[in-house]
UniProtKB/Swiss-Prot annotation:
SUPFAM superfamilies: beta-Galactosidase/glucuronidase domain. One of its GO terms (biological process) is skeletal system development. Belongs to the glycosyl hydrolase 2 family. It comes from the Eukaryota. InterPro entries: Beta-gal/glucu_dom_sf, Ig-like_fold. Ubiquitous. This is Putative inactive beta-glucuronidase-like protein SMA3. It comes from Homo sapiens (Human).
Length: 140
């Protein structure tokens, strides 16, 4: 038996997650979009530019029912819209429809009947190209 390359525990396999996202924008296609994934401490876990992509969550802290895990309240959640920590410049009236699909690395669903893993997904910057948010009177 080769011990130089030990098998990793199941926790490592199940702790890494992928978030496939697609955001439909029903307005002009002249915009810049950056999607950020934040953890419970509002720290960026991963980010991507564009209306679709895949975010990686390494070492994801999954939600567990009370008394079923030593850290049961470690939740991620997602939101979009005009959040106080977003930097939004002047925008045309847009209708954003978020279609999020949480998948494990092998393509199995991690939502539904299983303990649901919610992720904090923020549309952190959405503005027309060439529009400076600071010049528009909004903090960057």
């Amino acid at each position: 038996m080769d011990r130089s390359n030990p098998v990793k525990p199941a926790l490592d396999y199940f702790s890494n997650r992928l978030v496939n996202y697609q955001i439909s924008v029903k307005c002009s296609n002249q915009f810049k979009l950056e999607v950020c994934l934040l953890n419970a401490e509002n720290k960026v876990v991963d980010n991507q530019a564009g209306t679709q992509g895949q975010l990686k969550v390494l070492g994801a802290n999954l939600w567990w029912p009370y008394l079923m895990h030593e850290h049961p309240a470690s939740l991620y959640s997602w939101e979009d819209g005009d959040c106080s920590h977003q930097s939004l410049g002047p925008l045309p009236a847009c209708d954003l429809c978020d279609q999020l699909h949480l998948r494990s690395r092998q393509g199995g669903s991690v939502c539904g009947c299983d303990p649901c893993e919610q992720l904090l997904l923020l549309v952190s910057q959405l503005r027309a190209p060439g529009v400076d948010s600071a010049a528009a009177g909004r903090p960057v």
